[in-house]
Amino acid sequence: SLAPYILLALALVGLGDTLYLSYFQYLNLIPTCAIGGCEVVLTSAQSKFFGVPLSYIGLVYYVYMFCLAFLLCVEPRSRALRLGALAYTGIGALYSIYAIFYVQLSVLGALCQFCLISALTTWALFGTTIYYVRSNRL
């Protein structure tokens, strides 16, 4: 199955996105945003979790996802890895729904394109994982 390799590629997309945001966060700068809401989102109180920028947490999420996808490339039949990937991407997908639809749209009234890229990547990871798990009949 190509699914583990797709997961690997998607994890790299997420890594690139969060690395870019983390770089700007580290320099205390706001990246240029085509849709105009990045400054509102990235400077809000909700952009940090106990003082840690969410871009850093996203970076860790995608590093771990990359490692998990790599292990799935090596051991594609591992039930534990497939279930772990399903749980991990499911949690990521749920959080991204909360972050985009509740926090950004309802609370802040603004959208960040980089957050949207991360959310779409996370949903694609979850969808690919569901397909992978179902096609391998746990």
Each predicted region: which residue ranges?
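Membrane-interfacial helix-loop segments of redox and metal-homeostasis proteins
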Residues: 1-138
